[in-house]
C-alpha cells in the first residue's frame, strides 16, 4: 500500500506505475492540501475511498477509464468510483442516463439495478 499524508490503498500494479508521480513536488503539495481539507471540512468521498478505482482493478485488467466532471457532494453519495453510489441509495440521474445509453447501444436491458459499480 502506498501512503501519502492520507492512508489510501492502491493495488500493487498501479502503485508501481504511479510511484514516480507520487514523488513529484506537485503531488506532494496536492496530497498535503487534500489532507488539510479533510481535517477541517466535510469532504467526499471518505478518505478510505480515495484512489479506490486504483485498488479494485489492477492496471493490466483496465480497459476503460471514465473520469467524472462533477463529483457527488452529499453524505454517503461519493464512494471513490465515478458515477457510482452505495447500493442502498437511489440511482443518480447521471448514472440512470449512462445505463440508458448502454442499453440503447447493446439493444437489450441491463441487469444492473443498483448504483454499486464495484462488481
Where are these regions (language model features)?
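A polyanion-binding, active-site-adjacent surface
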Residues: 20-119
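Generic N-terminal amphipathic, Lys/Arg-enriched alpha-helix
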Residues: 5-18
